Amino acid sequence: MSPTPALFSLPEARTRFTKSTREALNNKNIKPLLTAFSQLPGSENEKKCTLDQAFRGVLEEEIINHSACENVLAIISLAIGGVTESVCTASTPFVLLGDVLDCLPLDQCDTIFTFVEKNVATWKSNTFYSAGKNYLLRMCNDLLRRLSKSQNTVFCGRIQLFLARLFPLSEKSGLNLQSQFNLENVTVFNTNEQESTLGQKHTEDREEGMDVEEGEMGDDEAPTTCSIPIDYNLYRKFWSLQDYFRNPVQCYEKISWKTFLKYSEEVLAVFKSYKLDDTQASRKKMEELKTGGEHVYFAKFLTSEKLMDLQLSDSNFRRHILLQYLILFQYLKGQVKFKSSNYVLTDEQSLWIEDTTKSVYQLLSENPPDGERFSKMVEHILNTEENWNSWKNEGCPSFVKERASDTKPTRVVRKRAAPEDFLGKGPNKKILIGNEELTRLWNLCPDNMEACKSETREYMPTLEEFFEEAIEQADPENMVESEYKAVNNSNYGWRALRLLARRSPHFFQPTNQQFKSLPEYLENMVIKLAKELPPPSEEIKTGEDEDEEDNDALLKENESPDVRRDKPITGEQIESFANKLGEQWKILAPYLEIKDSDIRQIECDSEDMKMRAKQLLVAWQDQEGVHATTDNLISALNKSGLSDLAESLTNDTETNS
């Protein structure tokens, strides 16, 4: 009999793996682990899970014994090697990192995180990325919660940069898709006027002056203030603006907007009245900039009343405030997908924002040093930001295009377009000619024979119109000499014969008279027609009278309902018809040739059905231009099955005419 295979024993396997892990750490070689893994009985999953437990057990002992960070990192490096050799699960190194960062103090976490930063290429590899990205994100967020934003600024920045390097640009977890604001960023300042020392400070400065004490800046280093008169009201209004920069949606509220408008005008007036010169900048700061010295600053404002005068005299501080204005204005004017439909600026607000934006750019250009260059750079960056805003509104599609599965590119054979490929492909089964105007003309009447039979294509004049002049000349009372009569004109005679053949029965009736020439024959026909047709006017019309009659006829045509309906649709008509269209706007949209992307944009912009209907009609008007007429709109309504609305629009048009 064959011997029975050995069964897997968890305690024995764990002891063996723990011993092998210690040996591998001492030798700095993974071979002991590989040997133990191959010799132990059991399935691969059982051995992997046991080795994962062994790693965590060894790491726990090192943390309890307060071992150096190098020993801890050696265990994690060994686990990375184990994943590469397929002897432990891919999530093991990340679990170990999480355990270490949870147990060690912040100063040692800095060393551990340096190791994490150096191995970013490892984390992004196919072996580790899918299994570890959520662990790393959770680990970094937990670490950020432990860190102080004011004392550990650099460490927090390193974590954010690491996440930016680890995840692709289109990663949803870091995009703030719903455009939320950091409402926790509250700027605290003195709101009790009784505790303010601004008035006392300025009084003492005027009477006694300010002495330079030991430890303060000397004459060479102290920036000269711009002598801005600061009181508590200016201090309070200035720092109150930070709440609007923190939460811009307050500007859509009527009362809050008035407060923001008032405070902003006062603060910007102070910036305009008290401008800074290059000489007011700190000499020490200027020397550091010239020599390439490191310029370190902290983004959180200091709101002490004692610093207000120095802050307003600081060019960098002014730039911060003016930049906040520009960012706020860009949000208020921009199209944000998740912005509520109620958040709409009035014309007055839009005009004020436009004027104030110009003033802010002007203040930036006048602010030293290199104000003009800085202003242009900021304007360029904010213009570029519009592209990112559009990308975000579209759902942040990935910039990376996936390769086709076939390695060999197949040759694309261009098929010659058949008539069926471009005839009747539009939403209204339109024939696409390739030009907007030609397409419109071609589709006025799809049936060519019916178009030829249309009354509008009847160019042949009536007998009365054509022979009116000849009948007047044939009247003896008018005394027109024979040589000046129209019947003597050969061109007129040729056209007269063709018209008589089409419209007069006398042309085919036999006659006993013998005519020597065409003028004589036409003279005889004119006399016959004069007896049958209504009598002409008593006076021979002059050229001016004919022009006046033509103008009157043209005016009458313009006053006719058909011509009125051929005029472009007005804003009042759009407003009135949108209320009737309502929820049926989406049925009409394809028949107005509105693109699917525009329809989706209309749905995102507003939840009100009447507003969506109005936006649809406005988009159609912008698309068609002068061809956006009520007649074309009625035609589209009939084709879409909305005949009731088409009849209502027809009645409204005739009533208004």
Swiss-Prot record:
Annotated stretches, region: Dock domain: 133-167, 227-397
Phenotype of gene-disrupted mutants: Mice show early embryonic lethality and severely diminished fertility.
Keywords for the protein's UniProt record, in alphabetical order: Acetylation, Apoptosis, Cytoplasm, DNA-binding, Isopeptide bond, mRNA processing, mRNA splicing, mRNA transport, Nucleus, Phosphoprotein, RNA-binding, Transcription, Transcription regulation, Transport, Ubl conjugation
Keyword Transcription carried by entry: yes
PTM-bearing positions, type Phosphothreonine: 4, 542
Positions where N6-acetyllysine occurs in the chain: 133, 300
Residue ranges annotated as motif Nuclear localization signal: 414-430
Residues that bear N-acetylmethionine: 1
Record-linked PROSITE patterns: DEATH_DOMAIN
Entry comment describing in which tissues the protein is expressed: In the inner ear, specifically expressed in inner and outer hair cells (at protein level).
PTM info: Expression is altered specifically during apoptosis and is accompanied by the appearance of novel forms with smaller apparent molecular mass. Polyubiquitinated, leading to proteasomal degradation; probably involves NEDD4.
GO biological process terms held by the UniProt record: apoptotic process; mRNA export from nucleus; mRNA processing; RNA splicing; signal transduction
Residues recorded as bearing Phosphoserine in the entry: 2, 537, 560
Chain positions covered by the region annotation Disordered: 194-221, 533-569
An annotated GO cellular component: nuclear speck
An example molecular function term from Gene Ontology annotations: RNA binding
Domain annotation Death: ranges: 570-653
Skewed-composition ranges (Acidic residues): 206-221
UniProt cross-references to SMART domains, sorted A to Z: DEATH
InterPro entries listed in its UniProt record: DEATH-like_dom_sf, Death_dom, THO_THOC1
Functional note: Component of the THO subcomplex of the TREX complex which is thought to couple mRNA transcription, processing and nuclear export, and which specifically associates with spliced mRNA and not with unspliced pre-mRNA. Required for efficient export of polyadenylated RNA. The THOC1-THOC2-THOC3 core complex alone is sufficient to bind export factor NXF1-NXT1 and promote ATPase activity of DDX39B.
Subunit and partners: Component of the THO subcomplex, which is composed of THOC1, THOC2, THOC3, THOC5, THOC6 and THOC7. The THO subcomplex interacts with DDX39B to form the THO-DDX39B complex which multimerizes into a 28-subunit tetrameric assembly. Component of the transcription/export (TREX) complex at least composed of ALYREF/THOC4, DDX39B, SARNP/CIP29, CHTOP and the THO subcomplex; in the complex interacts with THOC2, THOC5 and THOC7. TREX seems to have a dynamic structure involving ATP-dependent remodeling. Binds to the hypophosphorylated form of RB1. Interacts with RNA polymerase II. Interacts with LUZP4.
Family: Belongs to the THOC1 family.
Record's comment describing the protein's domains: An intact death domain is needed for apoptosis.
Protein name: THO complex subunit 1
Species of the source: Mus musculus
